[in-house]
Amino acid sequence: MKENLILKNKLKLARVEKNLSQDGLAKLVGVSRQTISSIETGQFCPTAKLALLLCIALDKKFEDIFYFE
C-alpha cells in the first residue's frame, strides 16, 4: 500500500458538465474563484467540508469528483 496518497480531482470536468464558471461555482460554495482554480489545478487540497460542498453544488458523489493516486 502506498504511504503518500495524493488527492486528485475531476472538478473542472464536473463543473463544465453543470455549465458553471469557476466564479459561479465559487459563489455557490462560498469561496473565491482563485480557490476553485487552485483545486482544479491540484495546487490546493480542499478541506473535507469544502469537498462535500462542491459535491452538493455539482450534484455528484465524492468519488465522482475526488480520487486518490
How would you label these PLM feature ranges?
Residues 1, 66-69:
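Short, charged recognition helix plus adjacent turn
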Residues 16, 27, 56:
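Alpha-helical residues within the helix-turn-helix
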Residues 41:
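Short, conserved catalytic or interaction motifs in soluble domains
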